[in-house]
A protein has these predicted regions:
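Surface-exposed loop/interface segments of Gram-negative outer-membrane beta-barrel transport/assembly proteins
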Residues: 2-79, 97-99, 103-225
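Long hydrophobic segments that form regular secondary structure
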Residues: 91-92
Length: 225
């Protein structure tokens, strides 16, 4: 007998761009920079604010609609599973069985922070000395404390990409022999082998100074790194 089972699922989604959580292990405070989740924004923003107007956040221009168009994450996920079971009886009392299973999972996450997003503009917010000193996204030269903080992202935006892949297969072969002697003696023999393998891969890429409006040409300075 032969039995085949298979299934696959694919998901493509676009989510608002955001960074990972920062946890203060001393005070227990949890915060997330550049959080533009629409539900969170609507829940924590005053209703008297005009959603089409431009305000200031992180010392840079901010508009929620502009952010959703210029700071987002594209997610692609694939999950496929297949199973094969084969049973064969070459002679009376002997059954051979082969079971194989294969699973493959892949996910890709691309975070686009375009030139005009609040996050990219925050790295360039230094209109006066007060903002320069207060903006934590500017670079302060540790070797020259008297120099004003400078931007590490004079042009362009940011790009983050992460790939996660996993392949898993399992093969099991068994043999079962059963025989009755003189209608009162029963002999059962069973043997088998199993082979399992799991392989995981993770790749990450971070690009700085990518000019989305100029053919994705990078322009960056070494202080960013």
């Amino acid at each position: 007998s032969l039995n085949l089972i298979g299934g696959a699922a694919y998901r493509k989604q676009r989510a608002p761009g955001t960074l990972g959580q920062d946890v203060d292990v001393v005070g227990g405070e949890v915060k997330r920079d550049f959080d533009i989740n629409p539900y969170s924004y609507a829940s924590n923003t005053s209703r008297v604010l005009d959603p089409s107007a431009t305000y200031v956040a992180n010392y840079a221009p901010f508009n929620i609609f502009n952010e959703l168009n210029n700071n987002y994450i594209d997610l692609n996920t694939l999950d496929a599973r297949f199973q094969l079971e084969l049973k064969y009886k070459p002679v009376k009392g002997l059954e051979l069985s082969l079971l194989g299973a294969f699973k493959y999972m892949a996910s890709t996450q691309e975070h686009f922070v375009k030139d005009e997003s609040n996050q990219a503009l925050a790295y360039r917010a230094m209109s006066n000395g007060i903002i320069r000193d207060a903006n934590k996204y500017l670079y302060k030269d540790p070797n020259n404390p008297y120099v004003l903080p400078m931007t590490v992202l004079p042009y362009g935006g940011l790009y983050h990409k992460g790939d996660n892949r996993m392949s898993d297969y399992d093969i099991r072969a068994t043999a079962n022999y059963s025989h009755t002697f003189a209608d009162k003696h029963i002999m059962n023999l069973f043997g088998g082998m199993e082979l399992t393998s799991i392989e995981r891969q993770r790749n990450a890429f971070e690009g700085a100074g990518l000019r989305y409006d100029a053919g994705m040409v990078p322009f960056y300075i070494y202080q960013y790194f």
